Amino acid sequence: MGSSNLELIFDSVGHFGRYQIFLYFICAFQNISCGIHYLASVFLSVSPQHTCRPPGNVSQVLFQDLSTWQLEDIWTQFSVGREDRILVQLQDGAIWELTSCQRFRRDDQSSLDYEYSGQKSSFPCLDGYIYDRSKWLSTVVTQWDLVCNREWFGRLIQPTFMFGVLLGAVIFGYLSDRAGRRLVLWASSTGVFLFGIAAAFTFDYYSFIVARFLLAISGSGYLVVVFVYVTEFVGMKSRTWASIHLHSFFAFGTMVVALTGYFVRTWWIYQIVLSSVTVPFVLCCWMLPETPFWLISGGKYEEAQKVIDTMAKWNRTRPCKLSEILSLDHDGSAGNKPSQVEKHTLSELFYDWSIGTRTLILWLIWFTGCLGFYTFSLNSVHLGGSEYLNLFLMGVVEIPAYVLVCLGMDRVGRRNILIFSLLSSAVTSGVIMVIPKDYHVWLVVASMAGKFFIGAAFGLIYLYTAELYPTIVRSLAVGSGSTVGRVGSIVAPLCIYLSSVWIFMPQLLVGTLALVSGVLTFLLPETLRRPLTTTWEETEKESSSGKLLSTTSNTVLENVTVENSEDSSLNK
């Protein structure tokens, strides 16, 4: 059945009535949970100041000008980023020099003094570490000593999670077309809850990574399928607005992470609290109906009619008869008769030199958008001041970014908004690099601006990509772009660690990519008020003619999500 005829359903029962609003906010609520887990590692994997634990009971501690009886008292004097030696004398009289990753035993034990020129022996930290617990009572790092030669274990927590995100989009996108959207929404959200709780009760690092990996697969699967679910229940007149603002609920998840991190300072309790956000949706999701689009595609017309009747009843509108709409296809009076869906390969995105260049530019924009989105968020806790407030503000600033996209894309054009957002993000990254690191407030403000612009670019790239390709490869183009974007998400936490080379290295990388992407976007055509094309020939003709015709962005989302929901994923 032609997908255009299905829109007659919404013309009858309403494009965004009470029923769709009810379903929309139920589904969007779970997006908060996904946003939570995507950034939960910001505080889960905090690595506090630490020093080697001495091999015995301490009788006296000397640190700079502080003399005390226990090591825990020295953290107020500790300098961040400075390798300070701590002198301790054990109850057996042995004197040790302690650093963050090594300890030295002095041969001469006559006096506890920094001035020492005698022999000393080096030993690894076999007795573990003592951590500064003034901020966090416990983190994953302190739980399993992920410091020094095990530091890279801690640095893999977020990249492995993002790899799970990549895998989950593929798995659940495939399953949703076979088993239905409703079942997959229930399974993925249940997985988010169960694996989120399981991560809090893991017994070692490896089981924690596995639980988080499965959590990422489930959360990513939900984000993929909920986008399809929402767009198949919302009519064309409201579809673009509704789909873009699903991002806003993800941003609320970022704020919840910041608030929870502020009030809960033990990692496993923090993990349980964050995972509990999923409970309301898990309890309610069994009430969600299957989408009429999926039911019709599977020949379940009676079930589809029941859902349509329910929509009409809730919306207080006139119900439509599905049999009448279906008959339009059979008598040929509207739409087209169903045809076999032809499989297309990635090579078709390189149809010719011009299209191949277009594809590579869009892939770069997808990569830059995801890389910048997570780099600004993850790096916010390193800007100074309150890391909790910083992260909270990074979530707040996303919401006006999506409003900008919705208001601006139909007025000044998709390409112009994208160019402005990318170049502004590049300029903001440059501004951050010239702000002295002691100016915490200005660094946070500039980072918020960077997150605003890169968020706007990311919120628009899905729609823009869909409009640049003909119907025969539209889903493939969007799916490949989102996959490249997820690679950027995997790289983002690794990019943050480059700050150990130079404090502003992450901003330099993001700013450079945003600048290059913004300049290259000038080579792409504008799609505002241009008709969607079906074949490559139409695409070439439209590009060469430059003719402007009336169309709506909502049609793009309808075509992409209905024709091949497996590849159409709006996934962070």
From Swiss-Prot:
Its main location: membrane. It catalyses: (R)-carnitine(in) = (R)-carnitine(out); spermidine(in) = spermidine(out). It is a multi-pass membrane protein. It holds the Pfam family Sugar_tr. One of its GO terms (biological process) is single fertilization. InterPro entries: MFS_dom, MFS_sugar_transport-like, MFS_trans_sf. Keywords: Cell membrane, Developmental protein, Differentiation, Glycoprotein, Ion transport, Membrane, Spermatogenesis, Transmembrane, Transmembrane helix, Transport. GO terms for molecular function: amine transmembrane transporter activity; carnitine transmembrane transporter activity; organic cation transmembrane transporter activity; spermidine transmembrane transporter activity. GO terms for cellular component: cytosol; plasma membrane. Glycans are attached at residues 57, 315, 559. PROSITE patterns: MFS (PS50850). It is found in: Cell membrane. Gene3D superfamilies: MFS general substrate transporter like domains. The chain crosses the membrane at residues 21-41, 156-176, 183-203, 208-228, 244-264, 268-288, 359-379, 389-409, 416-436, 441-461, 476-496, 503-523. Belongs to the major facilitator (TC 2.A.1) superfamily. Organic cation transporter (TC 2.A.1.19) family. Facilitative organic cation transporter that mediates the transport of carnitine as well as the polyamine spermidine. Mediates the partially Na(+)-dependent bidirectional transport of carnitine. May mediate L-carnitine secretion from testis epididymal epithelium into the lumen which is involved in the maturation of spermatozoa. This is Solute carrier family 22 member 16. It comes from Bos taurus (Bovine). The gene is SLC22A16.
